[in-house]
């Protein structure tokens, strides 16, 4: 028997044919097992301890078993008066210009100036320009002075859905009464879907028409 068979069994050609060779370095194998054991002890995810034993303990639960509080899902909001299966859909804020263009301008419901939401006023009534909670007849003048009566009347007509006017405050005392009669004629002619274009006449100031 040769000496190399005991000290180096890997070099023996007879021992390589499907046989398990003995470990030539048993000390290295023990050191590897000890190092692996230290790594397993240092990693809390592999071996979870009790919650009171270590401060770095964390549960290794799969995301399916996580409680509902950790998931970013809002509870469904039920529609009042609806079935439990129906949920309220989020409503995008409506644009004032877009929603106003979709309104029927011939409807009798009044609209407040600067708002696109219908107010609970009866047919043929408009909100008061000074106090929106007061009801005012369509086309009625506000008795607060002749120079401003035509502007308030135009605001009421604009609130009813006929059209809007860009008016200037009269500088002369008698100018307002003459313009009020002119506005009555203009609104009688253009009481429809849009406001007609008004030409500038000498002696009556500047008038601008808008659709």
From Swiss-Prot:
Q: Which domain of life is it from?
A: Eukaryota
Query: What's the name of the protein?
Result: Putative uncharacterized protein FLJ44790
The protein's organism comes out as: Homo sapiens (Human)
